Amino acid sequence: MTLIRRVAFLSLHTSPMEQPGSGDAGGMNVYVRALASALAASGVEVEIFTRSTSSGQPAVEHPDPGVCVHNVISGPPRKLPKEELPELLHSMVAEIERIRQRQPHGRYDLIHSHYWVSGVAGLELSRLWGVPLVHTMHTMAKVKNLLLQSGEKPEPRRREDGELRIVDGATRLIANTPAEAAELVSHYNADFDHIDVAPPGVDLTVFTPAFRPRSRAQLGVPAGKFHLLFAGRIQRLKGPQVLVKAAALLRSRRPDIDLQVTILGALSGAKDFDLKSLISAAGMDDVVTHHPPVNAPELAGWFRSADVVVMPSYSESFGLVALEAQACGTPVVATRVGGLSRAIFDGRTGLLVDGHKAADWADVLEALYDDPATRGDMGRAAALHAQGFGWQRTAAITLESYHAAVDQYIDSHRIPVGHSP
């Protein structure tokens, strides 16, 4: 078995150093940094390449032992819409190669790219360096376009074509769930034998259960409130509008419920999505509070303060928020889509809802309010369920995929045994 010593991560459109829940930063940012750290703890050096978005950024950052982040200078020193990044691909590839040439070691055993822009760059770097490419989609254009919401632009054909090239050219693909692996096969004609399933993890040292009344007191959530929490980017695809409408309906039919809804996150995507106006139109200004995204320890506190975490997403490759909330001992109500069906044990650690009708969501939330004993049982089961999703497990499965990729690459390129690719 070839020893994997050094891996190049490509996360060009968003940095793992960014705060999740704003702009293009979300679960993938958490995934990239946490996986890199877990791999490093297993003895694999990880160097992450991401596009620099500020003239004040250092060239290299060291967030964790064995992990470094290269801020690649390409294009203007500011954040750009994802749609503009393909124009910078050749520039980014050239700059990454210049960085590699300046490194004392000068080589990587493998490339692991994240999201389609990085995957297209990874194809070129794989050819240039003579090493295998492993790719994780995180989201897919064809799947997103099937679930397109009113007012949202479809993913461009250029992205679909890029993803098809990646599926055809990558040595191996890593999916978050069996459902995602099936989507790769059905929508992109991927070879099932070249796909590995590695569920994301959760930081079990940060996201832990705690005494709920204490968490509420620390955040100013009154003891008698039925507290519903949404955490994520503010966009139609994540469904905060579904929660607002369901909460308004619940309030109208059950005025005896002392309701509080907290939304954590920042606007992402369509600029015409006005959450504040939606809240006002629903008559929920006195019930719904909106806060900017917070760091992981603070987020854990918010999860512990909630009676229920609500995820009315239209699409999720996995749904890290669901796992993090459960690790804190809080049940999750989510849409029965994508990876959420795997992240949540329906009926045991939370509930899955079919569709996005406000009445259906209000029914489920009302039933949980009326049954605090079941909420408590679900919370305890949720914390136990999440224990099976540590990042070291994800890293171990990913490392197996890397070894398979190297063996496959050596075999397909007829590299003599004993020589690294």
UniProtKB/Swiss-Prot annotation:
Q: Which InterPro entries match?
A: Glyco_trans_1, Glyco_trans_4-like_N, Glycosyltransferase_grp1, Mycothiol_biosynthesis_MshA
| Recorded family membership | Belongs to the glycosyltransferase group 1 family. MshA subfamily.
Q: What does the entry list as the binding residues for UDP-N-acetyl-alpha-D-glucosamine?
A: Q19, P20, G27, R233, K238, V294, E316, E324
Name the positions where Mg(2+) binds: F303, R304, A306, T330
What is said about its interaction partners and assembly? Homodimer.
Q: Which reaction does it catalyse?
A: 1D-myo-inositol 3-phosphate + UDP-N-acetyl-alpha-D-glucosamine = 1D-myo-inositol 2-acetamido-2-deoxy-alpha-D-glucopyranoside 3-phosphate + UDP + H(+)
**Enzyme's top EC category:** transferase
Question: Could you say which residues bind 1D-myo-inositol 3-phosphate here?
Answer: H13, D24, A25, G26, G27, M28, N29, K82, Y115, T139, R159
Report the function annotation for this chain: Catalyzes the transfer of a N-acetyl-glucosamine moiety to 1D-myo-inositol 3-phosphate to produce 1D-myo-inositol 2-acetamido-2-deoxy-glucopyranoside 3-phosphate in the mycothiol biosynthesis pathway.
State the gene name recorded for this protein.
mshA
Name the species this protein comes from.
Answer: Arthrobacter sp. (strain FB24)
Q: What is its EC number?
A: 2.4.1.250
Name the record gives this protein: D-inositol 3-phosphate glycosyltransferase
Q: Which GO terms describe its molecular function?
A: acetylglucosaminyltransferase activity; D-inositol-3-phosphate glycosyltransferase activity; magnesium ion binding
Q: GO biological process annotations for this chain's record? A: mycothiol biosynthetic process
Name the keywords, alphabetized. Answer: Glycosyltransferase, Magnesium, Metal-binding, Transferase
